[in-house]
Amino acid sequence: AQDFERTKLTAVGTTPSDIPTSADFDSDDTIIGINMANRTANSITASCFMTSNQANDDIAFDFNITVTVAGGNFILDGQTKPALVLYRGFTYTFDVSSNTISSGSHVFAFATEADGANSSGYTTGVTATGTQGQANAKITLQVTDSTPETLYYYCTAHSGMGNTITSTNAHFIVKDAPIPAGSALQLLDGGAKMVVQNGDRMFFQSSTASSLD
């Protein structure tokens, strides 16, 4: 017999929330229904999207990346200079507060060529806050339709510390769907179903804070 389970997300807002929380699907699963309910007294828009199983998808899955330095390499979320896959339409925050950055006089940055060759530093949609290597320092990167398909993260002072960033599209099941106050949007009802693969992630997002169940 087939097992069924129900997973609930509460008070989803503008930051995408994933099911299972902070994890990939660990097997091929069948999804037979998705219910997106507006918990507010105002109309909202809501989205549901998938990210596919690919190398290093666990890095930046929550749109936050912790940056440290070890062995002459940038370490991102515990992995040594991994290639990154980022999704268009979202903003990623790189935590660059670790003293392993400042102690080696490293500077984390983006470029359109490896190691920032040929003065190729990339600053479009990039916002830096604080001083790298000190508390609360961060860099945000807004990935849009105009972001180059391939970028690089690198150290402005030392070569060979970074890797590639690939910008790609998330797979939307529904995008910016209007949901009136007190109403819900139901997907896949009526016998329809969707099979997700091991390693996939499913995200939900609302146009306003804490408005989607």
Give the predicted meaning of each segment.
Residues 24-32, 87-93:
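Extended extracellular/luminal ectodomain segments enriched in beta-structured repeat modules
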Residues 1-29, 46-48, 197-199, 205-213:
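C-terminal interaction-tip segments
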Residues 57-170:
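Extracytoplasmic copper-binding redox domains, predominantly the cupredoxin/blue-copper superfamily
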Residues 36-41, 89, 97-101, 207-209:
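Short solvent-exposed strand-capping/beta-turn motif centered on an Asx-Ser/Thr pair
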Residues 50-56, 171-201:
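Intrinsically disordered, low-complexity Pro/Gly/Ser/Thr-rich segments with frequent PxxP/GP/PP motifs
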Residues 37-57, 206-208:
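Short acidic, flexible loop segments centered on an aromatic residue
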Residues 32-33, 147-153, 193-208:
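Noncatalytic modules at the cell exterior or secretory-pathway interfaces
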Residues 21-24, 35-42, 143, 204-206:
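Asparagine-centered strand-capping/turn motif at beta-strand->loop junctions
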